[in-house]
Amino acid sequence: MGNLTEQELKELASQLSHPKGENGIATAKSMNVANDNMIRNVINQIDIFDTINILEIGPGNGLHINYLFEKNPNINYIGIDISELMVQDATELNSEFTNSGKAIFELTDGEIIEKENSSINAIFTVNTLYFWKNPKEYLQELFRVLKNDGQLILGFVPKSTMEKIPFTKYGFELYDNESVQNLLEEVGFKIEKTVSETEEVLSNTGDKKIRTFTVIKALKL
């Protein structure tokens, strides 16, 4: 499956940024596999406590939220996604949590976060940074909705790795660690830690790949 045509690479890139149709469901499943370790690493950086309000940007089908609730069942989770298909899929697949009101998945435009100022304790996101239309403005939105002492955890694959992946030339904005740190600090966040890990994954093109990912934890103080 590794020898995809340019058109297939474009379609894959489009699905990764905005899953839709039958291929969108399949792409979400492949992302679960490819990003599982990365998602867990990001979640592990959240200081979780009872009644914490957690917002995730781009949860896809959201199958990983069970890991959050295993850490503490008394959390409030909101997942926002630009894909209507993913919002529907995540709501159905996580009915144990959505039916009880512990979790909710909502559609977003990817630019404005429809939440009150200082209403969220922690925000996390994995592999969405590349698709933000206006990254500085979006980070300002994240800063706005976070409470004081709020946590932001970003998981992404840095430019040095991403530029070797053929489909990332279609619609991906690539970042190195320093550029992300600078963006965060420009908005007013304080960087608490930056960690990197190298892993072997089954990529979205179906091949086994070695990749390095970065997790940055920042605070609103």
Task: Label each region the model flagged.
Residues 164-179:
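Acceptor-substrate binding/catalytic loop of class I
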Residues 149-156:
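Conserved beta-strand signature within the Rossmann-like core of class I S-adenosyl-L-methionine
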Residues 33-52:
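Conserved alpha-helix/loop element of class I SAM-dependent methyltransferases that forms part
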Residues 53-112:
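Class I SAM-dependent methyltransferase SAM/SAH-binding core
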